[in-house]
Each structure stands twice: as C-alpha cells, then as structure tokens.
From Swiss-Prot:
PANTHER family, per database record: TASTE RECEPTOR TYPE 2 (PTHR11394), TASTE RECEPTOR TYPE 2 MEMBER 10 (PTHR11394:SF63)
Tagged with keyword Glycoprotein: yes
Membrane topology value: Multi-pass membrane protein
Principal subcellular localization: membrane
Organism listed in the record: Homo sapiens
Family as reported in the entry's similarity comment: Belongs to the G-protein coupled receptor T2R family.
Pfam families: TAS2R
Glycosylation sites recorded in the entry for this protein: N92, N158
Protein's UniProt name: Taste receptor type 2 member 10
Tissue specificity comment: Expressed in subsets of taste receptor cells of the tongue and palate epithelium and exclusively in gustducin-positive cells.
GO cellular component: membrane; plasma membrane
Sequence intervals crossing the membrane: 7-27, 43-63, 101-121, 127-147, 180-200, 228-248, 258-278
Extracellular side: 1-6, 64-100, 148-179, 249-257
Length: 307
C-alpha cells in the first residue's frame, strides 16, 4: 500500500505529465495550423518537432517509472526493457536534438560577437542552420545505431538486455555509453546558451551606460531573454539530475521514494520548458491568450444559460 508521501509524488508526476502534454500539444497545434497556412518557418519546424518528441518522452518517463514502481519484476524477462530502452533513446535523443537546434537558432539570431567566424555564421544563418540540423540528426542516428549494437551484443551475451544482478559499475558504464549522444547535445546546448547569455548581458550593460536612468523596450526584452535562458539551463540540469537518480534506482529497487523523486525531477523539464516557450514566444503567447479568452467566453455563456 502506498504511503502518503509516495501518493503525493505520484500525484505530482501525473500532474506534470498532464501539463506537459497540454503545453507541448498546444505548441505543436499552433505550428501545425501555421503549416496548413503555408506559414511554417524554421523556428516553427523546430518547435513542432520539439513538442512532439517531448510528448513522446513524457509517456516513456511515466511508463518506465510506473513499471519500476508497481511491477519491477516485469523487467526480469528482458524483452520489455529492450523495447523501453529503444523508445527511451529515440524520445530522449530526438527531444535533445530539437532543443539543441533551438538553442543554436537563438544563438545565431540574437547573439552579437565580433569574432570573424561567428559573424560569418550569423550572416549565413539560413544556410548554416539547416546544415547544423542535418548534422545533429546524422550524429543522433549514428549514436542510435551504436546503442542498438550495445543492446544487441549484451542480449546475445546474457540472453537478456539487462542482467539485474550485474555489477553496478558495469551497469553505470553501459548507461554512460547509452547516453553519449544526449550528453553531447546537452553540452552543446549549454555552451550556446551560456554564450548567448554573455552576449545579452554585455549588450544590456552597453544600453544602460548609453541611456542612463532609462530602461527602453529593447533592454527589457534582453533582460527577459536572459531570464528565459537561465530558466532553461536550470530545467536542463534538473532533467539530468532526475535521469541520474532514476538510473541509480535501477540497481536499488527497494527505494521507491527515491525513484519517485527522480521521476518528479525529470518530468519538470518537458512541461516547464514548454510553458517558458509559450510565455517567451510572442506568437504562442498571443495564441494562448486567445484560447483563454475563448474559454472565459464559453464559461460566461454557460453560466448565463444556467441562470
């Protein structure tokens, strides 16, 4: 029987999942409508892919977590954990791939450095960005092929994907190998976000020194962008902390509370960043406000009919 604390964690995780599906579903729907109107831009394509991959990732996180909590013995057969591992790699890497592409897009569009290479890349953003997206996709596919080889070799050797009695050191080494592509995308996103924050911070200081005592709209926009980026980095780090906790819990199966905490921490990123994107993107924000206004109007009409 679940304890009160465990019940609270499950409620939080389910709530995060619902918010994540709604938030990312809204982002995907808005951009799909633009696609139907032949207005889908590069950023729209990235946001749509990011939303779809995160919805898929949320379901994998919940499915894997609930299996480990309620029926951990199912994984002993080997086949299910093999499928979950493949789905996890696909969802995780595709989500990271689109998130990295989004970071690079904002970096090339917004950042301002005097470096010759950066200026060359910035002047050719429309050419460089598709190339970078394809490069990231190819690296993701190569990494997935490598992961498939690792899982297949281990299955052939042990007649199961994961031997639940394997040494912890061997298990963690294999997890690092499985997540090499994710670590690469995470590092690249982190670097681009940090450089973008530095660029915005420098530009903000210059504007404040030129216009003493005043904060124009551009300054406010730059401060807002820095807050969004810092929030993104914090959520990104929390996501990896949650992943590390969940991976470690696989070798300590009795500690359900720690596993639930890891699930809760991991699920913060997919739903939290979706709402940050909605609030930070003018098109998505306006669309969300229109939806809220429509809901308020429907509620008022319903109340009038009742009275």
């Amino acid at each position: 029987m679940l304890r009160v604390v465990e019940g609270i964690f499950i409620f939080v995780v389910v709530s995060e999942s619902v918010f994540g599906v709604l938030g990312n579903g809204f982002i995907g729907l808005v951009n799909c409508i633009d696609c139907a109107k032949n207005k889908l831009s590069t950023i729209g394509f990235i946001l749509t892919g990011l939303a779809i991959s995160r919805i898929f990732l949320i379901w994998i996180i919940i499915t894997d977590g609930f299996i480990q909590i309620f029926s951990p013995n199912i994984y002993a057969s080997g086949n299910l954990i093999e499928y979950i591992s493949y789905f996890w790699v696909i969802g995780n890497q595709s989500s990271m791939w689109f998130a990295t592409s989004l970071s690079i897009f904002y970096f090339l569009k917004i950042a301002n450095f005097s470096n010759y290479i950066f200026l060359w890349l910035k002047s050719r953003t429309n050419m460089v960005l598709p190339f970078m997206i394809v490069f990231l996709l190819i690296s993701s596919l190569l990494n997935f092929a490598y992961i498939a080889k690792i899982l297949n070799d281990y299955k052939t050797k042990n007649d199961t994907v994961w031997d639940l009695n394997m040494y912890k050191s061997e298990y963690f080494i294999k997890q690092i190998l499985l997540n090499l592509g994710v670590i690469f995308f995470f590092t690249l996103s982190l670097i681009t976000c940090i450089f973008l924050i530095i660029s915005l911070w420098r530009h903000n200081r210059q504007m404040q020194s030129n216009v003493t005592g005043l904060r124009d709209s551009n300054t406010e926009a730059h401060v807002k962008a820095m807050k969004v980026l810092i929030s993104f980095i914090i959520l990104f780090i929390l996501y990896f902390i949650g992943m590390a906790i969940e991976i470690s819990c696989f070798t300590v199966r009795e500690n359900k509370l720690l596993l639930m905490f890891g699930m809760t921490t991991t699920a913060i990123y997919p739903w939290g960043h979706s709402f940050i994107l909605i609030l930070g993107n003018s098109k998505l924000k306006q669309a969300s406000l229109r939806v809220l206004q429509q809901l308020k109007c429907c509620e008022k009409r319903k109340n009038l009919r009742v009275t």
